[in-house]
Amino acid sequence: VSFSYRDAGVDIDAGNWAVDLIKEKVRSTFGPEVLTGIGGFGSLFAFGGYREPVLVASADGVGTKLKIAIALDRHDTIGIDLVNHCVNDILTTGAAPLFFLDYVAMGKLRPEKVAAVVGGLAEACRANGCALVGGETAEMPGIYSGDDYDLAGFIVGAVERDRVVDGSRVQVGDLIWGLPSSGLHTNGYSLVRKLLEGEPLDRFWPELGRTLGEELLEPHRCYLEPVRRLLAPRVPASAGAGPESGGASADAAAGSGLRAQDPGPTTRGSALGTHGSMVDVRGMAHITGGGIPGNVSRIIPAGKKALFRWGSWPVQPIFKAIQELGRVPREEMLRVFNLGLGFVLICPPGDREKVKSLVPEALPVGEIVAAEGDERVEVTGG
């Protein structure tokens, strides 16, 4: 009796088929900066447009939101979640994305599922001017069972050394601005699934205006474009413009499925801050796991505290439904979910009018005050 790799649960032919299905999607994210094709051992990327670039790297996943995608057998948006999450993470330093890599692992490789996932990755990479330069698709029988799979992403961006944003310049009196989230984004799904266990995902919820499944799969919003308008200029406004730069057009961005993302051209690999107006952004936080307190505290210097005013921003119905269903205390909700704020910026009060002019959706949600103890974040009112 002879055995093959397929007998052990690994289908090389299925893997090759998956690669064939995703080739064009991946290639569609390439610009002239990508020096290698698909299938090499490593990806070569040449970038310019910076005086003194600092590379910024991050890795992340999408958590158990995957279980919702699996339950609905819809895999075309989970890649959008992953890319946008990673872009937002490096954006907090002022970095623009350069390139992205992904890792997909499943118990039994299904080429069509891989193609749907990578299609979402490529769509978001195009919208954000980021090249999808490589990845790994692993078939791992015995590690993942049934339809389960996992997804992780790795991003590299760049920022000028003298334009790094790290929170160190945050001062008492600075204003805190919030940008609305598109919903749960990619955090808190284990609690949500526990509370909604047995609830049909295809049931229409009047308070949501759509089915529960549609609400839970709403893509993680990307904040690159609104933040780009606020950051101080890095390069002249005319530099790198035009379709030859590899950037996504406004039509492509608007039709990308990232409905909360502002339309507008994105130049791959270009330094942020091409807008003519300047706002002194002193700190930025992406509100993910840990909520507002856990993430904003990471950028507040000692002796200062971020004071948020509860009620100064809208909280989407999905969060209210979760809190009521599980009788979850507000303190726990704040620790787990973004509660309507997906991204936070800290700017001096003198820039108030410029912030409102450049990003009308930005909401003043608090201010920086002096702190007596170790607490870096406080939410008052409500």
Task: Kindly give the residue locations of the regions a language model identified.
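Acidic-glycine-rich active-site phosphate/pyrophosphate-binding loop
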Residues: Y50, V54-V56, G61-G63, L201-D202, ...
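Glycine-rich, acidic
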Residues: L184-L230
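A generic structural signal for residues located within well-ordered alpha-helices
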Residues: V10, A14, I78, N187, ...
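Gly-rich Lys/Arg/Thr-decorated short loops/hinges at beta-loop-alpha junctions or inter-strand turns
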Residues: S2, G61-I70, F204-T211, I300
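N-terminal amphipathic/basic leader segments beginning at the initiator methionine
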Residues: V1-L35
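Glycine-rich beta-alpha junction loops
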Residues: G61, G157-V159, P180-H185, R193-L196, ...
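Glycine-/charge-enriched secondary-structure boundary and capping motifs
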Residues: S2-G9, E24, K113-A131, Y144-L151, ...
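Glycine-rich phosphate/pyrophosphate-binding loop regions near the starts of catalytic domains
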Residues: L21-S182
